[in-house]
Structures are given as C-alpha cells and as structure tokens.
Amino acid sequence: MGSRPPCGATSSARRACQFPAPMAAAREPELPQEAPATEPAPPPACRFFLEGRCRFGARCRQPHPGAPAPPGREAQPEAGAKKPPLRTAADVIQRIRWDPRLDPADFSVGYVDRFLGVREEPFSAFCWDQPLAALGPGVLAVPQHRVRFFRFHGRLVWDRASRTDLVFGSGSAAGRGPTILDAPNTEGAHGAEGAEWTLAGTGQEAQAAPKRGSTRPLCTGHQEPGVEEPGELEAAQERALGTAADLGTLAPRGRLAGVTEEALKPTAATRTTLLGGKEAQALGVPGGSAETTEAEWGPAAWPEDKRARLSVAAPCQPRPTHFVALMVTEPGLQAEVTKAQEYLVHVAPHCANFLVPSQNLHLTLALLRLAGAGEEAAAIGALRRALLAPGLNAPPRLSFRKLVLLGPHVLCAPPSPTLESMAQVLSQRLEAEGLSTLQSPGQLHPHLTVAKVPHGSQVHLPKLEFTLSQEVGCQPLQTLWLCRIGRTGGPFQPLAEIRLE
C-alpha cells in the first residue's frame, strides 16, 4: 500500500485550495468600487408618451423625454411651503390693552356678526377681561375667532384674510415686518397712505381719553403751516397741563405769567432744553413771553389750588380726532383776510408758506375724540340736539377787526362778541350726550387764524399794524360743521353741516 500523507499536510493543502494565497490575489486586477447610491433612481419615462398615446400632457406624473418643462414647475415646492406664522387676534388684543405706548381708544375692531355680517366697533366698547359666559345682555363682547381685523385711526393694521400684521410685524416671509411703532413721525391719522403712522411720541387721534392717559407718551408733531390745527391754543393747554393735573403737579402762575418778557427771553433756550421738544412746543417756550402765554391760555389756565412744579416727565395728552367749527363763508371776510395775508407777506416774505388758505378759515368751538364711522354718526346726532336746545347764547353775527399775535407762531383775529361761553356750553352738552370732549384747564378762546407757523420752526411771525374793514369783516353764525382732523400735509375733512335754528 502506498504511504498516506500526513494529516497536517492534507489539511494545509485543503486550505490552500479554498483560500488563494495573497500573492495570487495581488496579481489579479482590482475591481473599481461603485459609489453608494445616495439619490433615488429617476422614474421611468412615460411609456404612453413614448408610444404617442399619453393624454395627460403636462399634467402627467411620469417624465416626458424631450418635452419642454411647464412654466412655474420649479416654483411649485416653494408655493407649497409653510406660511410664516401670524400673531393671533388674542395677541393683538393683549398688546393693545397692556402696551403703555398704545391707546386702546385709537383702535377699532372688525368682527363677524352671525346675523348682521361684518361689523366694526371701537376697541374700548368691548369687554375683554371677562369670559363670555359671565356676561349679561347689553354687554358687547365677541369670541376671538370672530375677529377679522383691527384698525388704527381707520387704517388696517391687522387682517386675518390678507395676513396683515402691523402690530407685531408677523406674517412676513422675510422676517419681522414694519409696525406702527417703527413708522416715521407724522401727525394725522385719517386719509393717509402707506405706513405713515402717529404713535409713540408723535401726535395721535383717538376716541376717548381713558384714565390711563397719564401713562401715554403722546404729543403733537409738526403740522402743515397752511392748515390751522383746530383749537391749537386749547389743545396746547390740554397737552401741557391736562396730564399734569391728573398727577397733581401744575406750575405756579409765577413761573410763566409773573415773569416779564425780558426775564423770560434769556432763559428760553435753557427751559426748552429742560422740558424737551414736545413739552416746550406745547408750552410755546421758544421766543414766547409771559404776556403772550397769558393771552394765549387766559388767566384761568393755571388752577390756584394746585401750585407745584410742572413735571417735565409728564406725557402729553392724545390729540383730538374731530372738532366742531364755524366755517368762514362770507366772501367779504375772506377777501379782508386775504388782504391781511398779502400785507404780512409784504412785511415778511419768509412767512408766505405759513398762510391759512381762505377755504380753511374757521373758528374751533369744541374738540372731540371719536373712533369709527359709528361714533361719527352718533356725534352728528348729538351735535344737532345740542344746537337745537335753548340757552346756547349764540350771537347772530361775528365781527373781526384787530389782528392779534399769540406768541411768535400764531397770527389770528379774535371775534366780537367772544365765543367762550358758547364753546363751554356746547362742550358740556356734547359730553352729556356721551361724547368724549377735550376740556382745557382754562376757557376755550375761539379765534380766526390767519397765519400759523408749525411748532419747532425758527420762523417768528411779525406783529402787524393792520385792521380789518368793519363793513365786510363779519360772519353770520348760522351753521356749525363737524370736521375730521387730517394728517400732516392734508386739510381737515368736513363731515356734516348743522344749522343752529
């Protein structure tokens, strides 16, 4: 018998057959490694298109080789992207209620009534602090999901349908958008375009003056010189002293009225710096004398029972939104005022831009704060009832003779007889009707403004030695107008004419 190989040799040979030697493997060419498939394979072409029988065309879900791509197909993923979040109506309500820079009286709410459709009411007319189930009949409340939009002075600042948010700046794909707090310093609220707003240190127009008005830093801004700000002197009283009266801090009479003109002029710049721009404008400090301030505000402008220093940090009261005025319609009086304005331009040519147009000549008798068309309609009815009630003491005719310079910025003609008592009775009647009227610390002094320089301007009006003709300088007192205050650069808007008879 032949000899058998050792057991170990047999095992080694068997392993050599099963596993090739490393040298043998090195002689073989290496196969290229395929890259891992990270992208899914493209879908197969539409076989019906290849056969010429596809009826879907561009709507087909399978690719069509050689067919042009439909326009807008690349933008489809963006169109289906998630919209940026929009702050809810509840957020806007809380912001309006608790932000000290916002006045709830400046806002109105549009909501859906199940029976009447979309309605709009002032923000302050709603009850926001109680659940709906706890409210009884006669209380205006609305679920937050029925709120459709918010308006600020008639402008849309939050809208659910168009995803507009100018309160928080949400809803914009580019991030935080503009808000009413970021707008430039303007003054009016009605009829303005774009993002010109009046808030946070600028003039405001609102409905009512609630008790929290002492915390609102609201003042008047610059106004077009050709348009008189209604009740400019009376509004200055309210802005400068109304809030200070709430805080129990009023300046003593000697601070302004008891100082001579020569003593006041050297300290005018210093006082302007201490009070700041808005307070100094309201007080008429730049170039203003004690005598002109006394003539502007009247001797009763400073209450005797509260004689403390005027708080320089006291914010200004919000501006009125509407006013009641006697419009100058007599052609003879308009012609006399035009002659006075021409004489003013002849004496001071730089004052040509500050003349009040003849169509805007008026005397302000009452200042109101209204919000929305509903309150405007109610104000028209209340004004009609107030004028028809006896005891108004309205003179049949007014005459104008002298031109009075009220400070360095206002040239006016006071009427004869005066209208202080009539304006006071009218404001009391309107307030009794439930309207929000602005009451100045002293009496109102209605006057016919001939020229007016905006606050903050360095231009001073000169004193004129001009007298209006007594024969033609008259205006019958037969009708009054309810007007809406316009924004900066625009005139006021007459809303209703009401006869006194």
From Swiss-Prot:
A zinc finger (C3H1-type) spans 40-67. GO terms for molecular function: zinc ion binding. Keywords: Metal-binding, Zinc, Zinc-finger. Gene3D superfamilies: Cyclic phosphodiesterase (3.90.1140.10). The keyword Zinc-finger applies. Residues 1-43, 61-86, 203-234, 281-300 are annotated as: Disordered. InterPro entries: AKAP7-like_phosphoesterase (IPR019510), Cyclic_Pdiesterase (IPR009097), Leng9 (IPR042653), MJ1316 (IPR040459), Znf_CCCH (IPR000571). This is Leukocyte receptor cluster member 9. The lineage of its organism: Eukaryota, Metazoa, Chordata, Craniata, Vertebrata.
